[in-house]
C-alpha cells in the first residue's frame, strides 16, 4: 500500500506540473490576442466588476482562431497553439509510464478535461492588473483554487469518469462501424441480386408440367413409337412433375428393362460366342458334343482340341534311358553275369587294361611320395618359425610379418595334405582291383 500511495503522489505532482506548463503556454497564446478585444474585455470588467473566466477563455480562443484565418503571418503561431495542446511527456512521466503503462491512457483524457478549468485561472492571472480592486476577481480565484484542489483530491473519480467517457466513445464508434459494414453488405447483396436477375433467362422455367403439357408429351412419344419399325421398342409414357426419387427410379428401370428384353428375345444372330458367354457357360464333354449339334458345343469341342494341341506341343521330351521291357528269365541274368566275368578273362582285353592301370598306379605312387615329402618339409618350416617367434628376439613389426607367413604356410600345408589323401584313395582303389583279379594275390604283412 505504501508503494501505491507513493506512486499516486508522484503521479499527482506530475499532473500538476503538466497543468502548469499548459497554463503557461495558454498565457503565451493569449498575449497574441488583438488589443481591441482586450479593451472590450477591460470595459466589461470595469463596468460589471466581475470576471467570467470561462467566457473570457472562449472568446480568447475563438478570436485566436479568427486571427489566424485572417492574418496569414500568424499561422505559424496558431499552429504552435494547436501543437501546444498535445501532451508532451517529460522524463519523470516517461519513467512512470514504464512502471504503469495502463494508467497512461487514463491520465491523458483527465489532463484534457482539466484544461478548461485551468484556462480560467490562466486568463485571470493575465488580467490581474485590470481587476485587482474588484471583489469578484477574488471570488473567481477562490472558486478556481477550490476546483484545483477538488481535481487533485478526487483524481480517482475523474479517472472513473474518463474511463466511462472512453468506453462510451468506443461503443459509439463500434456501433457506427458496425452499421457501415451492414450497409455495405446490404448494398453488395442488392448488386448481386440485380446481376443474377440480369443473367436469368426471360422465359420462366417450369420444373413440372401439368394438363396440356402432359398430353403433348404423350402424343409426341406415341408418334415416335409408331414411326419406329423395330417391334421390340415399345412406346413409353413419361409422367413429368412427380417426386425426384420416383422419376429417377422409373428412368433407371426403363433403361434396364428394354435391354433385358432385347437380350432375351434377340439371340446372337452371328452364331459366335461373346466374351461374357465364355465366362458364364460351362464346357460340355466331348461325347455330348457329338450328340448335340449346337454351335455352342461345337465351339467347346474346338476349344478342347486347341487345348490338346497345346498340351502335345508342351510335352516333355522322353528319357533316352527309359526301360522299355523287363524280363524275368533267370537265364538272361546268368548270361549277363558270365559275360561280365569273361571280360577280364579274355586274353585280348587283359594286357591293355593291365598296362594302362600299371602306368596310372606308378604315377599315383610317385605323386603320393612327392606330396608326403612336401608335407614333411612344410611342417619343419612351420615349427622353425614358431620357435623363432617364441624366443622374442624380433621386433613387433617383424613378429607380425612372421605370424602372417606361418598362417600362409599352414594353409598351404593343409592343401597339400588334402591332395595327398585323395591320391592315396585312388591308389588304394587300383590296388584292390588287382587283388580282385588275382594278379597280385600275395601280400606281405608285417609289423615294424
Curated annotation (Swiss-Prot):
- Protein name, UniProt field: Bud neck protein 5
> Polar residues composition bias: which ranges?
264-281
Q: Which organism is it from?
A: Saccharomyces cerevisiae (strain ATCC 204508 / S288c) (Baker's yeast)
Question: Compositionally biased, Acidic residues: which spans?
Answer: 171-180
Q: How does it assemble?
A: Component of the GIN4 complex composed of at least BNI5, CDC3, CDC10, CDC11, CDC12, GIN4, NAP1 and SHS1. Interacts directly with CDC11, CDC12 and SHS1.
Q: What is its main location?
A: cytoplasm
| A molecular function GO annotation | myosin II tail binding
One GO term under biological process is: septum digestion after cytokinesis
Amino acid at each position: 500500500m505504501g508503494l501505491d500511495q507513493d506512486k499516486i503522489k508522484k503521479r499527482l505532482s506530475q499532473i500538476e506540473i503538466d497543468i502548469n506548463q499548459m497554463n503557461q503556454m495558454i498565457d503565451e497564446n493569449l498575449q497574441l490576442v488583438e488589443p481591441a478585444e482586450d479593451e472590450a474585455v477591460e470595459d466589461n470588467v470595469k463596468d460589471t466588476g466581475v470576471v467570467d473566466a470561462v467566457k473570457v477563455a472562449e472568446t480568447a480562443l475563438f478570436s485566436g482562431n479568427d486571427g489566424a484565418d485572417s492574418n496569414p503571418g500568424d499561422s505559424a503561431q496558431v499552429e504552435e497553439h494547436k501543437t501546444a495542446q498535445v501532451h508532451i511527456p517529460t522524463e519523470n512521466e516517461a519513467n512512470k509510464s514504464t512502471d504503469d503503462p495502463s494508467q497512461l491512457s487514463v491520465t491523458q483524457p483527465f489532463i484534457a478535461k482539466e484544461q478548461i478549468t485551468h484556462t480560467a485561472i490562466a486568463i485571470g492571472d493575465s488580467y490581474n492588473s485590470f481587476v485587482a480592486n474588484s471583489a469578484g476577481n477574488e471570488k473567481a480565484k477562490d472558486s478556481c483554487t477550490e476546483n484545483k484542489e477538488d481535481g487533485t483530491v478526487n483524481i480517482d473519480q475523474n479517472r472513473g469518469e474518463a474511463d466511462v467517457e472512453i468506453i462510451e466513445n468506443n461503443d459509439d464508434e463500434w456501433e457506427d462501424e458496425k452499421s457501415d459494414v451492414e450497409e455495405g453488405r446490404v448494398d453488395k447483396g442488392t448488386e448481386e441480386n440485380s446481376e443474377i436477375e440480369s443473367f436469368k433467362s426471360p422465359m420462366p422455367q417450369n420444373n413440372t408440367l401439368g394438363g396440356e403439357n402432359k398430353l403433348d408429351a404423350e402424343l409426341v412419344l406415341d408418334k415416335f413409337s409408331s414411326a419406329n419399325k423395330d417391334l421390340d421398342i415399345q412406346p413409353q409414357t413419361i409422367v413429368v412433375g412427380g417426386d425426384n426419387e420416383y422419376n429417377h427410379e422409373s428412368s433407371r428401370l426403363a433403361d434396364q428393362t428394354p435391354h433385358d428384353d432385347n437380350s432375351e428375345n434377340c439371340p446372337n444372330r452371328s452364331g459366335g460366342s461373346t466374351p461374357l458367354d465364355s465366362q458364364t457357360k460351362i464346357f460340355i464333354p466331348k461325347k455330348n458334343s457329338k450328340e448335340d449339334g449346337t454351335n455352342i458345343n461345337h465351339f467347346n469341342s474346338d476349344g478342347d482340341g486347341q487345348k490338346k494341341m497345346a498340351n502335345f506341343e508342351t510335352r516333355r521330351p522322353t528319357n533316352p534311358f527309359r526301360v522299355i521291357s523287363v524280363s524275368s528269365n533267370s537265364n538272361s541274368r546268368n548270361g549277363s553275369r558270365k559275360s561280365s566275368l569273361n571280360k577280364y578273362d579274355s586274353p585280348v582285353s587283359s594286357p591293355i587294361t593291365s598296362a594302362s592301370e600299371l602306368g596310372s598306379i606308378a604315377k599315383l605312387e610317385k605323386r603320393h611320395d612327392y606330396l608326403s615329402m612336401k608335407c614333411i618339409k612344410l611342417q619343419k618350416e612351420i615349427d622353425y618359425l614358431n620357435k623363432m617367434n617364441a624366443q622374442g628376439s624380433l621386433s613387433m613389426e617383424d613378429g607380425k610379418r612372421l605370424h602372417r607367413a606361418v598362417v600362409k604356410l599352414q594353409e598351404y600345408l593343409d592343401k597339400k595334405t588334402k591332395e595327398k589323401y585323395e591320391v592315396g584313395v585312388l591308389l588304394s582303389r587300383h590296388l584292390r582291383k588287382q587283388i580282385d583279379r588275382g594278379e597280385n594275390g600275395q601280400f606281405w604283412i608285417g609289423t615294424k
